[in-house]
Structures are given as structure tokens and as C-alpha cells.
């Protein structure tokens, strides 16, 4: 998207919880980034919404509580256990570290025995 002055405008997104949905979202951004505006795209209803194209979306921050994800680049963390989303795109190094988010409501019942909680900011 461009402003009235012709400058490129990026839509900045923060990811809270680097689970399977986040993995699919990040992979989707990488996969569809270079698609043509009017091309039919399997898996994506519209490449442009509200004047923003998929290529205009950039991730600026990411947060999780898992020791396997905190401190890693988001491109690596989306593949960490227990994520098991189908891998459909190669995500380049993003330069977005996953930060420790607060465990406000605890780990989910099914994750408690499967995920080591990060000690950072506990």
C-alpha cells in the first residue's frame, strides 16, 4: 500500500502465542508474499484486504511462554515442539526474536506435561 505521498506503508503485526495458528500465518505470509494481485490463489480468499496486500504485512514482535520457542527467531520457533502444523512454505530468517510473554492464565491442561515453561520473566 502507498500513502498519498507515494511512500510504502507496512502493516506491522505482533504475534502473541507461537502455536500452530501462528505457524500457518507466518508460513502464509512467506508463501503468498509475491503473488500477483489478481491471480487465483488456493488457500487464500483475497491477497488484498482494505488496500493492504499480503506483501505489506510485516511481523514486528512475537511472544510465547515455551522454553523451546523463547529466544529463538520466529522462523525457527514456529517449527518447535509441540507445533505440528503442516509445513507448506520455507520461512527465511525474520530477525524477530520470540520474547517471553507473561503466563497470565497458566499453561493449558494438555500442554502442562508436554511443554517446559521458559524461566525468562517468570
Per-segment meaning from a language model:
Residues 2-122:
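N-terminal glycine-/serine-/threonine-rich beta1-alpha1-beta2 phosphate-ribose binding loop
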